[in-house]
Amino acid sequence: MFKLKINNFQLGFKLVQWPVTNHLLKHFYVFPINNKGGLAIKRIISLALFKKRLNKDKINNCHVWEEELPDGSYDMGFNGNFNHMEKRKSGYVTQKQFSEFKDANNQRLIKIETTLAIQGEQINKLTQTVEKQGEQINQLVQVVLLQGASKLENFKWSKKHKDKSLMPAWIVWKIFWWKV
């Protein structure tokens, strides 16, 4: 039994390492729950009650206690050698199994993120290539329009003036700007 005096409260408590049995141990001890003088009464409970409260399995030797709070509710604490169980849709799994499952999912998500990042970079490169090709196509279209306009005016000029001379450059520019 340890005795401790805090804020004019004399506290006594006893920690018991119990074997895994189904009988109820009734060792009470008191701990302060805040710095305003509030107290919580803790008692050691049996493993059966602990299993009933948590609805878990596979608990070995451990320290387990129940804390009765001033509002009438309770809080439970434990430490020692046991496998804490997490409930999932498929049933109960140990903390180790859950962490392995979580690590596997994290690795899978990291692979997906890296492939998405690589594909995003590839898409950016392809968009830049498409933009460059679009600019080249626009330049080629302008060249084709200029050549087509000059041939058309040369044809009209040669019919009108009955000679095969080339049309003046200012007429080509005038036709080009008029069509654009």
Swiss-Prot record:
Which InterPro entries does this UniProt record tie to the protein? DUF16
Q: Which domain of life is it from?
A: Bacteria
Signal sequence coordinates: none
Fetch the Gene3D superfamilies from UniProt: 6.10.250.40
SUPFAM superfamilies named in the record: MPN010-like
UniProt family annotation? Belongs to the UPF0134 family.
Q: What is this protein called?
A: UPF0134 protein MPN_127
UniProt lineage: Bacteria, Bacillati, Mycoplasmatota, Mycoplasmoidales, Mycoplasmoidaceae
